[in-house]
Amino acid sequence: MLNEIKLSLQYILPKQWLTRLAGWGASKRAGWLTKLVIDLFVKYYKVNMSEAQKPDTASYRTFNEFFVRPLRDEVRPLNTDPNVLAMPADGVISQLGRIEGDKILQAKGHNYSLEALLAGNYLMADLFRNGTFATTYLSPRDYHRVHMPCNGILREMIYVPGDLFSVNHLTAQNVPNLFARNERVICLFDTEFGPMAQILVGATIVGSIETVWAGTITPPREGIIKRWTYPAGESDGAVALLKGQEMGRFKLGSTVINLFAPGKVELVEHLQSLSVTRLGEPLAVSVEAVAADVAPAVISQEEADAEREANPLVDNDQNR
């Protein structure tokens, strides 16, 4: 009965308004009130502040500053094996495994469309059909910066407006096509392991999604798909990120979905649904040995041009 009420509220509550309100409040400097809210949050969610660079809650001027708090370097050592892809975030594995054609597992008995997740971009979807995916849920207590699993050259970013359903075990089991319905930012990279997509999925009270190269992507929420393209490696203006480097963050939290091309990587065997993830630990292993100094493979210009022609979204300059 309680779960039915919670699910009904997902469709009734004004999620966009609540999200704007939460984002507004989280960005305000309110002195003792800010500290009180942070202290209550830490206590309720059992946040481990000893891992933070600034463990004293009084050192945060806003709730957002606290929420995206950086960790001390030594608490999340990075696996430096060039054949290992690292966890992009702290959290819990929601689902992972093989992409069956166009179908990605959302929860037991529930699939959603790869192409729908990628905003109907069928050429991008073709890169990942029958590939591998991993969905990581970031709970309120977790570190909310997202990092690179491997070295990568950014080739494309797409902002997809959408719903703002809460993302949790209950909604994953009961809201059809949850991740393909919610607001999200899709980032496509060239890597040593072929193309990789890292998708930041929004949710109720996720005030903003940011990337390190473009800053705040949302808000504003204008209701239109936006697309940015970026040059290949070695080109002027290329955005190159290293394994373990921060690539984005949530204010407040949600979900990261990673997509890998078929035949390129194998997920670490012990990982399963509800496995706890820690940034920098092994997520997957290359099918073929990769030398440490190999440059990321790139999507050809012909493929990139064909994709742009097939998906005439709202294009923006990368220097936005």
Curated annotation (Swiss-Prot):
Q: Does the keyword Lipid metabolism apply?
A: yes
According to UniProt, this protein's pathway is: Phospholipid metabolism; phosphatidylethanolamine biosynthesis; phosphatidylethanolamine from CDP-diacylglycerol: step 2/2
Q: Which GO terms describe its cellular component?
A: plasma membrane
Site positions (Cleavage (non-hydrolytic)) are G253, S254
Q: What class of enzyme is it?
A: lyase
This enzyme's EC code(s): 4.1.1.65
Paste the cofactor note. Binds 1 pyruvoyl group covalently per subunit.
Assembly and partners are described as: Heterodimer of a large membrane-associated beta subunit and a small pyruvoyl-containing alpha subunit.
| Chain's role | Catalyzes the formation of phosphatidylethanolamine (PtdEtn) from phosphatidylserine (PtdSer).
- This chain belongs to the protein called Phosphatidylserine decarboxylase proenzyme
Whose protein is this, by species? Answer: Cronobacter sakazakii (strain ATCC BAA-894)
